[in-house]
Amino acid sequence: MMEKFRVIGSDKPLSGEVTISGAKNAALPILFASILAEEPVEVSNVPHLRDIDTTMELLKRLGAKVSRNGSVHVDGREINEFCAPYDLVKTMRASIWALGPLVARFGEGQVSLPGGCAIGARPVDLHIHGLEQLGATIVLEDGYVKASVDGRLKGAHIVMDKVSVGATITIMCAATLAEGTTVLDNSAREPEIVDTADFLNKLGAKISGAGTDTITIEGVERLGGGQHSVVADRIETGTFLVAAAVSGGKVVCRNTNAHLLEAALAKLEEAGAKVETGEGWISLDMTDRELKAVKIVTAPHPGFPTDMQAQFTLLNMMAKGSGVITETIFENRFMHIPELQRMGAKAEIEGNTAICGETEKLSGAQVMATDLRASASLVIAGCIAQGETIVDRIYHIDRGYDKIEDKLSALGANITRFSESN
């Protein structure tokens, strides 16, 4: 059965309040990092997502006791399997994050080569190279990455060949239990990395510099237990702010933080929105204001996030003037544009740039979700289009948005989930 969304568009603004979930991109590495802990950990503000369920199942396969009642509880004292098998990994690229913690704590680990969204080339080389520099032996065989080390990993000075969130997390986690100090240069600076470091430090790790491009990790002999609340999802926050902006509405996002998405907020203000922020909330008001096209260049944090690019493509399409969007992070990340063009959007793609603007109106159509963030832009487009939009393959959306239809409905959208046998 393939699940789909039916969205009935309207010219009524999307307005109201929305409670933002914890960030998937912090919750996942934190759950994998819990493999390092020799005592139970409790992680709260974890979003309800398929990738989270898969990760909990994977931890159980390794021998951990995992339960969820509000918070997620992980007790890794009895981990006795060191392999993340293909049947779980194939749907989720994040599984590579099991490798570093397994080899750091147990001296061995293997992970099937990963799957996930279809956005360009995303190799695991940087993860592998980092672990090798910490003293692990890596072999690739039968579709598995196998890591091993005699004794403990050894601290090292590592310069990342390119900025990678995933590899920064792998190396940082593995280095927590290494002998000696690791200095990680050219590390990624994303808030989710800071959150993972905060979690590890609560368990007894000695990590400093997370959020800068040099992270220092003094290895410790063991990690204990602890409690941690996952940082807010900045991309979900931005998605709902854009929904209000393109529909001429007013929305308040709760349980989130302005410092997480300063680049996107600056662009929303440039686009004509009134943005206000406070302790744990952000509001955007577009009532009776004109939407103006903005120039976007995606870049690693603290630059404009690639995961907000599709939403701002839609914003530019509906705005006055012409906006150029340049995608520097991933190749093949304009797959949402042909789908939006089916709804009547105006855009031209030239290489890694998209030029959009001055779309009079969108008309409902059958569209297909291709990757996680692009799919959200199709759903929002459906909310402001004339007529009915059917969004197919919404399992992409479910991988990263916690109950998006309930949250949009609360803002006045007419959206329902249905399934039909293919």
UniProtKB/Swiss-Prot annotation:
It comes from the Bacteria. Its EC number is 2.5.1.7. InterPro entries: Enolpyruvate_Tfrase_dom (IPR001986), Enolpyruvate_Tfrase_sf (IPR036968), MurA_subfamily (IPR050068), RNA3'P_cycl/enolpyr_Trfase_a/b (IPR013792), UDP_GlcNAc_COvinyl_MurA (IPR005750). GO terms for molecular function: UDP-N-acetylglucosamine 1-carboxyvinyltransferase activity. Pathway: Cell wall biogenesis; peptidoglycan biosynthesis. It catalyses: phosphoenolpyruvate + UDP-N-acetyl-alpha-D-glucosamine = UDP-N-acetyl-3-O-(1-carboxyvinyl)-alpha-D-glucosamine + phosphate. The modification 2-(S-cysteinyl)pyruvic acid O-phosphothioketal is found at C117. It is found in: Cytoplasm. Keywords: Cell cycle, Cell division, Cell shape, Cell wall biogenesis/degradation, Cytoplasm, Peptidoglycan synthesis, Pyruvate, Transferase. The active site is at C117 (proton donor). Phosphoenolpyruvate binds at K24, N25. It is an enzyme of class 2 (transferase). Cell wall formation. Adds enolpyruvyl to UDP-N-acetylglucosamine. HAMAP family: MurA. This is UDP-N-acetylglucosamine 1-carboxyvinyltransferase. It comes from Vibrio atlanticus (strain LGP32) (Vibrio splendidus (strain Mel32)). The lineage of its organism: Bacteria, Pseudomonadati, Pseudomonadota, Gammaproteobacteria, Vibrionales. The gene is murA.
